[in-house]
């Protein structure tokens, strides 16, 4: 699994001109899922993401986690994170998991975050979405569960 995490002051996701998820302070998490991903990858990311110390403390130092500041997550499925651009000009997405597999893992990822006490808003799996955010910092991190 690959995630792009963006610290945000506010964020929302819209489908068919309707806002279906929004958060104030927290993370926008774009989640890409590949063929080999399992529940073990979910567990790794769920233990890592809410505890990343990327929010400022009273001294302006990045010392606080999402849990520490009571932040939320806007979780958006993003198969294009597995786009391969090595050949030609059109990415191929052969490394992205099939939708039926990816949707199940995406839902388990979100449920696992909720089980950790995190408020999670989501996009709609497989839908064309408009994601808006005010990037805070900006602070943007990329984590691949295979790099542990």
Curated annotation (Swiss-Prot):
One cellular component (GO) term of this entry: cytoplasm
Source organism, top-level taxon: Bacteria
Family recorded in the similarity comment: Belongs to the DTD family.
Listed NCBIfam families: D-aminoacyl-tRNA deacylase
Gene transcribed to yield this protein: dtd
Organism: Oceanobacillus iheyensis (strain DSM 14371 / CIP 107618 / JCM 11309 / KCTC 3954 / HTE831)
Keywords in alphabetical order: Cytoplasm, Hydrolase, RNA-binding, tRNA-binding
Keyword Iron assigned: no
GO-annotated molecular function: D-tyrosyl-tRNA(Tyr) deacylase activity; Gly-tRNA(Ala) deacylase activity; Ser(Gly)-tRNA(Ala) hydrolase activity; tRNA binding
Domain notes per entry: A Gly-cisPro motif from one monomer fits into the active site of the other monomer to allow specific chiral rejection of L-amino acids.
EC number of this enzyme: 3.1.1.96
Primary enzyme class: hydrolase
InterPro entries, A to Z: Daa-tRNA_deacyls_DTD, DTD-like_sf
Pfam families: Tyr_Deacylase
Motif stretch (Gly-cisPro motif, important for rejection of L-amino acids): 137-138
Localization per record: Cytoplasm
Name recorded for this polypeptide: D-aminoacyl-tRNA deacylase
Subunit structure: Homodimer.
GO biological process: D-amino acid catabolic process
HAMAP family assigned: Deacylase_Dtd
Keyword Heme: no
Main location: cytoplasm
Function: An aminoacyl-tRNA editing enzyme that deacylates mischarged D-aminoacyl-tRNAs. Also deacylates mischarged glycyl-tRNA(Ala), protecting cells against glycine mischarging by AlaRS. Acts via tRNA-based rather than protein-based catalysis; rejects L-amino acids rather than detecting D-amino acids in the active site. By recycling D-aminoacyl-tRNA to D-amino acids and free tRNA molecules, this enzyme counteracts the toxicity associated with the formation of D-aminoacyl-tRNA entities in vivo and helps enforce protein L-homochirality.
TM spans (from-to): none
Catalytic activity of the protein: glycyl-tRNA(Ala) + H2O = tRNA(Ala) + glycine + H(+); a D-aminoacyl-tRNA + H2O = a tRNA + a D-alpha-amino acid + H(+)
């Amino acid at each position: 699994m690959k995630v792009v995490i963006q610290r945000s002051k506010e964020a929302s996701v819209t489908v068919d001109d309707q806002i279906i998820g929004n958060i104030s302070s927290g993370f926008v998490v774009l989640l890409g899922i590949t063929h080999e991903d399992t529940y073990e990858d979910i567990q790794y990311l769920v233990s890592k993401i809410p505890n990343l110390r990327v929010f400022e403390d009273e001294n302006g130092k990045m010392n606080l986690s999402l849990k520490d500041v009571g932040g939320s997550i806007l979780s958006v499925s993003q198969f294009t994170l597995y786009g391969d651009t090595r050949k030609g000009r059109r990415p191929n997405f052969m490394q992205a998991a099939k939708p039926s597999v990816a949707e199940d893992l995406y839902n388990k990822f979100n449920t696992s975050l909720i089980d950790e006490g995190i408020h999670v808003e989501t996009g709609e799996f497989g839908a064309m979405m408009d994601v808006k955010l005010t990037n805070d910092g900006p602070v943007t991190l990329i984590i691949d569960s295979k790099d542990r």
